[in-house]
């Protein structure tokens, strides 16, 4: 793989970039073969390993020779008949071709994105999901409006080919890629893993994720430098400018229809600190702005025209929602949380030279809440309970051992507790814990053909202490009490779907 990266780096240093000859290298298909059977990088465990006995590098070598004899075109191999590969599975070798396309595209893309990120040192944190929650907790309370963008989950193949053509000028490779994309249009879907389950092939999932991430990267690579050039510097935190808050409030209450203050309104408006923040996770993007409603509508108009003219993406304005954070009970759904901004009143004693008085200081606070109703609905789909939240037994796991059942419930609860422990209210988490506890007990009772009381008497205190250990929760709770109440501990290490639920 390192040798392939060096070869591609040498090719990309010269213009134009020729990638088509790499499809005829046998090492490329060896890489695709290793990825195909690599359990650590797969989406789900391999259940059928019968391909191991049917794979042969000799057949791949003969297929490459056949491609070279047919005017160097890989398309006949892609569209070949099942009878042309006698004794071998045509779909499996087609998966290797898709793996070859993915490996060729990933290498120059990684080199290109690395150069882009190295030139923007202060934006390196946007690649990490761990930086999203602290950024939202620190910046969103100081914003007035949010732009929620739903990126279309279907992209036309020609749009991707046009974007690839900006940095790949190898016509045969682009024609081959166009043939693959037009033949399988379901490859170009969103990065939502629920929709990716519709794609049965592992290499198709990998290529689909790459195409989606590449397209999102192209959109972001144009927006980030544009905003940096527009604001010239990153916005400062408003916590250090508490004394300027009354000044901003006076600006908002200036009568703009008065001729006396009209010029003053225009001159003072540009003294305000600009604030704009961009976050994306999968197909959802959020732009936090501080300004007026007219400014937010202008941003939506310019973003729509930019994507339509530059990326040929006909993004309608109704796909960009405007949320006003100043309204009460106005929340938005992002990263599995119901997020909102609430007003917090603090009693402050102000001392002067001769006197002191007590006043109220109203501040904005970031308020993340775990969506209990949505979680209960997801549990109902996975057969852990009904739609009303009543636990039921997990019949698919009754064939497992008792330790396996307890370990699976323990893993599910640990992931949920780690991810949603940044929530301001823990009542919903305790309700989910109650559902999982009774579902675990009912699953064991169904396996042993007994009742929940018999299961409790049989396992005793080991039933729930083993599946839901309290030591881990007590450590987290004690550690959170030591820290300030304003700070939260985010455990955002869960970025992949748990496929134990579907087993």
From Swiss-Prot:
GO cellular component terms, alphabetically, are:
chloroplast
The cross-references to Pfam families, in alphabetical order and at most eight, read: Intron_maturas2 (PF01348), MatK_N (PF01824)
Q: Which UniProt keywords apply?
A: Chloroplast, mRNA processing, Plastid, RNA-binding, tRNA processing
Give one GO molecular function term: RNA binding
Gene Ontology biological process terms in this record: mRNA processing; RNA splicing; tRNA processing
**Compartments reported by the entry:** Plastid, Chloroplast
**Record InterPro entries:** Domain_X, Maturase_MatK, Maturase_MatK_N
Q: What does this protein do?
A: Usually encoded in the trnK tRNA gene intron. Probably assists in splicing its own and other chloroplast group II introns.
Family stated for the protein in its record: Belongs to the intron maturase 2 family. MatK subfamily.
PANTHER family registered for this protein in UniProt: MATURASE K
What name is this protein filed under? Answer: Maturase K
**In which organism is this protein found?**
Stangeria eriopus
